[in-house]
Amino acid sequence: MQLTGSEILVECLKEQGVDTVFGYPGGAILNIYDALYKHSGEIKHILTSHEQGAAHAADGYARATGKVGVCMATSGPGATNLVTGIATAYMDSVPMVAITANVTLPLLGKDSFQEVDIAGVTMPITKHGYIVKNVEILADTIRKAFHIARSGRPGPVLIDITKDVTAATCEYTPVTIQPEERVTRYTREELMLVAEMIHKAKKPYIYLGGGAIISGASAEVAEFAELIDAPVCDTLMGKGAFDGRSERYTGMIGMHGTKTSNLGVSECDLLVALGARFSDRVTGNPKKFAENARIIQLDVDAAEINKNIRVDASLVGDLKKTLTELNACLSKQEHPEWMAHIMELKEKYPLKYDDENLSCPYIMQEIDRVTNGEAIITTDVGQHQMWAAQYYHYTKPRTFLSSGGLGTMGYGLGACIGAQIGQPDKVCINIAGDGCFRMNMNELATASRYNIPIIQVVINNQVLGMVRQWQTLFYGKRYSQTVLKDKVDFCKVAEGLGCTAIRVTKKEEVAPAIEKAIALKAPVLIECMIPEDDKVFPMVPAGATISEVFDGDDLKRQS
């Protein structure tokens, strides 16, 4: 059948099972929006308040569902406003297709109105980028883009379409999209070598990253941990891949990881990294990371092997398939003395906080209790992000959504909106500091417009908490540009944008506020006032080895 480029785009989105797109219209993309209007019963379009919010919403949708998130923007500033969201998705391996329209082909390269080489701008932060100048290749380009976005190590793909292509016509033939194949690239000998190393270990430890969630390998990870009788630590991206209430679970590793995980990994004789990339925030000083251990790395991306840490063995391939094959090669191991030692560390070094005043750790524990750990938690970046990771028990994958690699302030609210649309039966709560919330709080208008029942918790300490913590510990308490004591009333802002607002100043007010927000089934902001001096512990100083982890008690003893 003969269709315009815009109609072909919509049909290809339907082929891919896309039910929601997030975006903002403009002149160059008008033809596409006209086609979307005609198919609004099949594909829902969420009009965000800013294109960055659209990118973050597509990201949150993708992380919460496992499907490809789709965002759209017009040429020029519309396209460039997507850049931070695309980079966020790239750093955390999130499948996304960003669709932009550009000026017509005769105007390209002439500094035309709202012309930007968005494919060039995003080249370093996408898996692939396409510029479509011919309607005949549009359908195949879209199909390739979705395949690239979700296959192997997922990531964002850009499709930039000139406006004349969206109006031109050609023959369109629908196709049936086949599921992606799970690929492995190791030999039987390599698999057996890894199994032998595991069997010889006396003090194994499992280090779990976001790849376990991406591949859907939670069941295989749990079986693996039981088979080799090992404790499990995770990264920010790995939250929920392993049951956070399991006795084997020792919490996060790295800069704000638990003492148990950091000390345990420093003592182990075998470290098995599952879908983890040895980020600098995890390893600390790489020369002294897990220096007593042989290291095995399982990852879908061959480029990650030996990139940050030299390993003794590796298996490259889809983690779920790899673990299925590896588990079949393993006999049941038992390490009672090692596990008893880890349990002693857990008992000796529990997470602690000052429970006299209202604090973010207390708030997260109350949210955990009220929701029974069943909510989807999104976060922005900073102290609140770490507290949300530490004090909520994540028992299932795709329930903790946070910007780990790029560390994007302003990420959480858009992501929460996307997650709520993707998982409408879940309670979705965004945890943000007052500094982060300022950056994209306009997306409350989006939640209000569509009555998306997200809960926005603002942890308000009137400072840029994480930066201020570093200034306190390492910069002589010189608080340069980290004090936010001004006249902003977040509750009034929320109400002005059409949301319900609740202010919490006491511990006993937290649970009722959360319960009320859930019951309202409408967008709600809860502002929680906490002390400016609260700090995130444990902590590993930048450049130090993870065995040098310290907490508030250690600081008191030193003073």
What are these regions (language model features)?
Residues 411, 415-453, 459:
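Catalytic phosphate/nucleotide-handling subdomain of diverse soluble enzymes
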Residues 295, 367, 379, 418, ...:
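Hydrophobic, well-ordered secondary-structure elements that form the walls
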Residues 1-330, 366, 370-373, 453-456, ...:
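N-terminal alpha/beta PP-like core and its mobile active-site loop of ThDP/TPP-dependent enzymes
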Residues 46, 180-184, 403-406, 476-485, ...:
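A short acidic, glycine-rich active-site loop
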Residues 6-10, 14, 18-19, 32-37, ...:
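Active-site diphosphate/adenylate-binding microenvironment
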Residues 27-29, 76, 93, 156, ...:
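Glycine-rich phosphate/pyrophosphate-binding beta-alpha loops
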Residues 136, 174, 292-383, 507-508, ...:
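Phosphate/pyrophosphate-binding active-site segments
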Residues 114, 449-542:
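Thiamine diphosphate
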